[in-house]
Amino acid sequence: PVSKGPAVDAGQAVAAALAIQEQISTLNEALKKEGQPALRMRIGIHSGTVLTGSLGSSRRLEYAVIGDTVNCASRLEGLDKQRHQGMVRILISGDTQSLIETLPPHIAHESWGTVLIKGRLEPLEVIELRSTAP
C-alpha cells in the first residue's frame, strides 16, 4: 500500500470503520435468519509510520506490517473490553483525531482521556466514535 498522506489515510481508516459499524446490523439480521450468532467487533485506529513488506526466510515469506503505530492500534482494539457496548466499538488515538478535518454530523465522539499503552512510555489520548444514526 502507498500512503496518500497522513490526513487522507486517517480519514479513510475512520471512514472504513464507520462503514463497518453502520452496516453490521444488516449483516447480523441476515445471520440471525440463518440461525447464526451475531457478530461483535472492536476496531482500534492509530496514525503514524509503519514498516511493511515481506519478512522471513526464502522458504517462508510472510507479508507483515510492524512498528509502534501497529502496536498502538492493536492495544486500542483490545483496551478495556468491559466498556464495549453495541455491536462495533471504534477507538481512535488523539493522533488520528488531529488528522481528521471533520466527522459526519451523525458521529458522536467521547474522550476516554489519556491511557498508558503497554510497550510505550508516552500515554495516548483515546476517543470512542459512535454512530447516532437510527
What role is predicted for each listed range?
Residues 1-4, 49-57:
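Active-site loop/short helix in cyclic nucleotide turnover domains
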Residues 34-36, 54, 117-120:
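Sterically constrained small-residue positions within well-ordered secondary structures
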Residues 3-43, 68-81:
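Alpha-helical scaffold within the catalytic cores of cyclic-nucleotide enzymes
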Residues 50, 81-134:
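Cytosolic regulatory/linker segments at or just downstream of nucleotide-handling modules
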Residues 46-47, 55, 68-94:
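Catalytic/regulatory signature loops of cyclic-dinucleotide turnover enzymes
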